[in-house]
Amino acid sequence: MVRAKRKLDHIEYALSTGQSRTHGFHDIDFVHQSLPNSSYETITCETKIGELSLSSPIFINAMTGGGGEKTLHINEQLAYVAKHHNLAMAVGSQMAALKDESEAASYKIIRKVNPNGIFFANLGSEATIEQAERAVDMIEANALQIHLNVIQELTMPEGDRDFTGVLQRIEKIVLNSKVPVIVKEVGFGMSKETMQQLASVGVTAIDIGGQGGTNFAAVENERRQRMLSYFNNWGIQTATSIIEATSTNNNLSFIASGGIQTALDVAKAIALGANTTAFAGYFLRILMEDGIEKLVDEIDLLHTDLKFIMTALGAKTIEELQSVPLVIKGETYHWLTQRGIDTTHYSRR
């Protein structure tokens, strides 16, 4: 019951605290092309995460599950939206269902709604090989997300305090998993050093989960008697984290998430080097406040606007969008300069 109550608290406080939108994309400007030599009708948006083919560079990221009927209903609706738009979808952490079988239905519902969909299972970095296998089997997942959430756990009143051995556990899961493993942050971003460590143990796909979206330090602080306010602005902004990712020069696929709400955010994230983008809090707010049809319509508009932007840039495919010239300025530029990451190749390609 404690875990289920926490799941419901997370939904409530994620909606009430909102998204900070401090993702850094305001520091990214595209170089206008007056002769794009492109046509809206021929733009295609297919992409890949590793060997996993996706019809869209937008997917529904991990949100919930394990909180009884309410979380079952949310996942049911999200799965319907994913089916309607042929989007991939991740579930929230399945540890609740591994600890209490009665909660499994809130995750299994997605496969009932969308039997042929692409779904990602989800567990924390404390998971064992056996738990990872059970989570994948529970929803017949196409991939497994392992989330890193140190700051959330430290801020959570009942959270973990020991983070030793995490990389070694991830390595074991990667070596034994029958599906691709995606390691993700939960809104605090990833540094190039972290990504290099993950690549060294065989991880091939990373969701950078940057600062700028749902702030899980703020969410957990709402549940505390004594707030750890120093964690409320902790992390690496989404745009910065994507560039840190691409600077590793590893053969990794990158997912951009963290405050992404618009087609321009999507286009900038991909142009910086992401293979796809993920939406969570923004979609949840629309679903909870305006209903499922409004969310379906919003995703239609996102795809339309993304194709308009790609047409303007002369990028006929997602791969071409990853090569358009752009200028990095402001705080993002200063951070990257201090970190010794060269940005000139973005503006001169």
From Swiss-Prot:
EC number: 5.3.3.2
Subcellular localization: Cytoplasm
Residues the entry annotates as binding substrate: 6-7, 152
Co-factor(s): FMN; NADPH; Mg(2+)
Residue positions binding Mg(2+): 153
Gene Ontology MF terms: FMN binding; isopentenyl-diphosphate delta-isomerase activity; magnesium ion binding; NADPH binding; oxidoreductase activity
GO CC, one annotated term: cytoplasm
Membrane-crossing residue ranges in chain numbering: none
Residues holding FMN: 62-64, 93, 122, 184, 214, 258-259, 280-281
UniProt catalytic activity: isopentenyl diphosphate = dimethylallyl diphosphate
Pfam hit, one: FMN_dh
Magnesium in keyword set: yes
Matching InterPro entries: Aldolase_TIM, FMN-dep_DH, IPdP_isomerase
Keyword NADP set for record: yes
Alphabetical GO biological process terms: isoprenoid biosynthetic process
Keyword annotations of the record: Cytoplasm, Flavoprotein, FMN, Isomerase, Isoprene biosynthesis, Magnesium, Metal-binding, NADP
Biological function: Involved in the biosynthesis of isoprenoids. Catalyzes the 1,3-allylic rearrangement of the homoallylic substrate isopentenyl (IPP) to its allylic isomer, dimethylallyl diphosphate (DMAPP).
Family under the similarity heading: Belongs to the IPP isomerase type 2 family.
NCBIfam families reported in the protein's UniProt record: IPP_isom_2
Assembly with partners or alone: Homooctamer. Dimer of tetramers.
Protein's name in the database: Isopentenyl-diphosphate delta-isomerase
Gene field: fni
